[in-house]
């Protein structure tokens, strides 16, 4: 099996390089990642200019674009052949709950599903035990032949930032959600132009049993199956009753 590895923290990030180190022991790998940190890029594509993949070492390329650009180029065959699976990560920090809306890590996996490849997004809930997350992925791939998922599903995996021996196990979860983000922070500009940093993520709000937040807080690896169908099916019936009363 040949695996494409991507991320949003950039090619030089410890997370992606740790993942590559582990996966190449058992699999053929191709690493294609942004040339700098592109956290929060979500599913954006670079459409305003051409993008350039640059070979850094054998099997590793950096791209002056977004995580989605990287996967799009790799799976379109313009970089070094085809792959069987895409693993995005290891992200530096959690992608829990509604983090997935903004996450370039999750977006890279989502692009892979758009292009017909199975995909995993993996994040470490911290910045220390990347080996733990890599070992989890190795174990999941070892047993992946027994997994059957519907088309269009990707797995969002969050790993507690603890030594591997301290993991409690694995839980299949749903996405929780956070309180609204903190307010933008004013920044000093040398020319006096109003400038702001985007506010930090807020604290978790829905951390009830069964959520990804709850699982990782108890020391479990969280695996949430997600897809791109954002339809709220429960709202269709009342919405239809309302629109049926409207004449155009």
Swiss-Prot record:
Enzyme Commission numbers on file: 3.1.3.5
Cofactor binding, note field: Binds 1 divalent metal cation per subunit.
A molecular-function term among this protein's GO annotations: metal ion binding
Compartment list: Cytoplasm
One annotated Gene Ontology cellular component of this protein: cytoplasm
Predominant localisation class: cytoplasm
Keyword Hydrolase: yes
Residues annotated for a divalent metal cation binding in this entry: 8-9, 39, 91
Domain of life: Bacteria
Alphabetized InterPro entries for the sequence: SurE, SurE-like_Pase/nucleotidase, SurE-like_sf
Oxidoreductase listed as a keyword: no
UniProt keyword terms in alphabetical order: Cytoplasm, Hydrolase, Metal-binding, Nucleotide-binding
Uppermost EC category: hydrolase
A UniProt-annotated Pfam family: SurE
Cofactor(s) this protein requires: a divalent metal cation
Catalytic activity field: a ribonucleoside 5'-phosphate + H2O = a ribonucleoside + phosphate
The family this protein is said to belong to: Belongs to the SurE nucleotidase family.
Function in brief: Nucleotidase that shows phosphatase activity on nucleoside 5'-monophosphates.
Name by which UniProt lists this protein: 5'-nucleotidase SurE
